Design a protein with these regions (language model features):
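Phosphate-group recognition and catalysis centered on beta-loop-alpha active-site segments
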Residues: 1-235
Length: 235
């Protein structure tokens, strides 16, 4: 039987307030999320070990919070019990993020996710208590929305759906990750079964359609990540 699916706010509540900001985090908790996802990026991608760490998905964000400012806010009383999904956009600053989470007493409440398997290996060695999520796929846009790329995109998607259950379950069993963070187009019952059998969780991103959220809840995924947490109670 499927359990209760966690409500995860993408960048806080990115459709209610600008993502990765304090107003967005506040909106997310006001609308009953169980977990807040946010992005961490070094100010200078050439100096990830020394430059400021920012709450930003990419370098187009004009005035991002620093990681310290974001964590200081998220340790407030109103966020007690809310879990965090800290999404590392690049490799190279894993230790600094772990140290910041330790300083704020947030290790036990945090899952760190990333596209980069080598970052997960580093994180596991740095802090075994952390939950780790492997994000897939590594793409910057949805190629199924263009007529020029539609057919090759669906061909890739069919192959990925066949291969991903075994690959993801292998990473879970090897201890490299505790969860898969998968784009909704990759989610199948076979993927969920493989992850459950391996002892892993499945979080699905980024779902901004109410009916699709309902289908994923019925399937029994661990968590659904959305820009608009109001959709969880809509209808």
């Amino acid at each position: 039987m499927p359990g209760v699916t966690l409500r995860v706010g993408h960048k806080g509540a990115g459709h209610i307030a600008p993502g990765n900001t304090i107003p967005s985090f506040d909106a997310a908790v006001e609308h009953g999320v169980d977990m807040i996802e946010f992005d961490v990026l070094p100010e200078d991608h050439l100096a990830p070990e020394t430059s400021r760490l920012l709450l930003a998905h990419d370098y187009s964000h004009a005035t991002p919070l620093t990681l310290e400012q974001g964590l200081a806010h998220l340790t407030g009383a109103r966020f007690a019990g809310v879990e965090l999904d800290v999404d590392l956009k690049l490799p190279g600053y894993e230790r600094r993020v772990v140290e910041a989470l330790r300083a704020h007493g947030l290790i036990e409440r945090t899952l760190i996710s990333t596209l980069y398997m080598r970052s997960l290996v580093v994180l596991r060695e740095l802090e075994p208590r952390l939950r780790l999520g492997w994000s897939v796929p590594r793409v910057s846009r949805d190629y199924t929305t263009s007529k020029l790329t539609l057919l090759p995109a669906y061909a890739w998607l069919l192959q990925a759906r066949r291969r991903l259950p075994g690959i993801a379950a292998g990473h879970i069993r090897a201890g490299r990750a505790d969860a898969l963070m998968a784009h909704w187009r990759l989610v199948t019952p076979a993927l969920l079964r493989a992850l459950r059998d391996a002892g892993g969780d499945l979080y699905v991103w980024t779902v901004d359609d109410r009916e699709q959220i309902r289908r994923l809840e019925a399937l029994g995924v661990t968590g659904v990540i959305t820009n608009d947490p109001r959709l969880f109670d809509a209808g």
